[in-house]
């Protein structure tokens, strides 16, 4: 049985942003398993660098939806049929589609004025980054930031066909096993470079990791 999981950047982003394609699988994995969690210091840095831009992209998706509403034929009081049509015709597959569908499903009453709807949508756009920050704080409270000292040059060479950013995470996760003695798996949303084409078997053959687990939602 696995004692610990080492997370790549995509898993952290997937958990913290519910509009991320992999959010629900990442959330289930992190909240329903009781093992120790680790991320590397460079994963933390990469996450913090990307968080504001991703939040802005999602907020822009909500603002685009507001613009569509303002330029539509809807006006005055909307009923449940109107809001159902809005969900079907105006939400689309933009960067905020998950948040928007959840908003219409759970926060919009059967009757609502268009102005009130737009007001609430603006509030939703402002909350995107704060929600991600709160999720990140929850995650970091459960996670140990790991700094590797050993370069493991022989393993690094054996994994050389794997891109460096992914290879580095493999070495970081291997270091946890070496230093802590915990049965550890690597969790990723990037199966192309860490699971597919024999990469999983290569990693398990060259490192002390128990498994490489893909949380990716594939199309």
List where the protein language model places each region:
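Acidic, PIN/NYN-like endoribonuclease modules and their adjacent C-terminal/linker elements
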Residues: 4, 158, 162-163, 170, ...
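Repeat-unit-sized solenoid/scaffold elements
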Residues: 76-85, 131, 209-219
């Amino acid at each position: 049985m696995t004692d610990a999981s080492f997370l790549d950047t995509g898993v952290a982003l997937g958990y913290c942003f519910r509009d991320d394609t992999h959010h629900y699988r990442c959330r289930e994995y992190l909240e329903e398993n009781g093992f120790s969690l680790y991320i590397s210091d460079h994963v933390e840095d990469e996450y913090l660098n990307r968080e504001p831009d991703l939040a802005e992209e999602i907020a822009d998706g909500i603002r685009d939806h507001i613009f569509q509403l303002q330029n539509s034929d809807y006006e005055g009081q909307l009923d449940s049929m109107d809001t159902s049509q809005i969900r079907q015709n105006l939400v689309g597959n933009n960067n905020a589609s998950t948040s928007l569908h959840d908003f219409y499903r759970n926060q919009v009453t059967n009757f609502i004025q268009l102005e009130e709807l737009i007001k609430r949508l603006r509030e939703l756009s402002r909350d995107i980054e704060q929600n991600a920050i709160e999720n990140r704080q929850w995650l970091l409270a459960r996670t140990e930031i790991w700094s590797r000292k050993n370069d493991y040059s022989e393993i690094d060479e054996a994994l050389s066909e794997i891109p460096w950013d992914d290879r580095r995470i493999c070495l970081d996760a291997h270091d946890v096993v070496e230093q802590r003695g915990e049965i550890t798996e690597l969790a990723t949303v990037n199966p192309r470079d860490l699971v597919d084409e024999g990469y999983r078997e290569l990693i398990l053959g060259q490192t002390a990791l128990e498994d490489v687990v893909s949380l990716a939602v594939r199309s």
